[in-house]
From Swiss-Prot:
Belongs to the thioester dehydratase family. FabA subfamily. Its EC number is 4.2.1.59, 5.3.3.14. Homodimer. Keywords: Cytoplasm, Fatty acid biosynthesis, Fatty acid metabolism, Isomerase, Lipid biosynthesis, Lipid metabolism, Lyase. One of its GO terms (cellular component) is cytoplasm. This is 3-hydroxydecanoyl-[acyl-carrier-protein] dehydratase. It catalyses: a (3R)-hydroxyacyl-[ACP] = a (2E)-enoyl-[ACP] + H2O; (3R)-hydroxydecanoyl-[ACP] = (2E)-decenoyl-[ACP] + H2O; (2E)-decenoyl-[ACP] = (3Z)-decenoyl-[ACP].
């Protein structure tokens, strides 16, 4: 039985990274340091811009986060690719929440725009994922648009985020 709540704590997300949240066949989130959220604050099957599902999650920003020490020395900024990866993570998490099974793999993105940055002085990053379609056949795949906000201001958008769940990744 899938653990289908509307919100999840950091402990829940860590359980997902160990394969304990959505069962032994469900997709896993990455473990820290690659886990790019502290909590999921909202999940619905019928919300979002397209009425086909919505996920909202948050990451607390502190100056001691690992990436600020190396990207870049003297000019610390969160790598934009980590925000993109967080959106892919949330698409896969949603597929597990729906009961999908398999190993999650990012399959692509249509267009990404960066119009701002996450600095060590920020307080919170918010991720919003708006599902356009979920395909549940031999391949389970989610297609969604996403946005990243820092302290309430939109700084990234991504169209056509795609994540698939694979029962066998040996030929992927």
């Amino acid at each position: 039985m899938v653990d289908k709540r509307e919100s999840y704590t950091k402990e829940d997300l860590l359980a997902s990274s160990r394969g304990e949240l959505f069962g032994p066949q469900g997709p896993q989130l990455p473990a820290p340091n690659m886990l790019m959220m502290d909590r999921v604050v909202k999940m619905t099957e019928d919300g979002g811009k397209y009425g086909k599902g919505y996920v909202e999650a948050e990451l607390d920003i502190t100056p001691d986060l690992w990436f600020f020490g190396c990207h870049f020395i003297g000019d610390p900024v969160m790598p934009g690719c980590l925000g993109l990866d967080a959106m892919w993570q949330l698409v896969g998490f949603y597929l597990g929440w729906l009961g999908g099974e398999g190993k999650g793999r990012a399959l692509g993105v249509g267009e990404v725009k960066f119009t701002g940055q996450v600095l060590p002085t920020a307080k919170k990053v918010t991720y919003r994922i708006h599902f356009k379609r979920v395909i549940n056949r031999r391949l389970v795949m989610g297609i969604a648009d996403g946005e990243v906000l820092v302290d309430g201001q939109q700084i990234y958008t991504a169209d056509e985020l795609k994540v698939g769940l694979f029962k066998d990744t040996s030929s992927f």
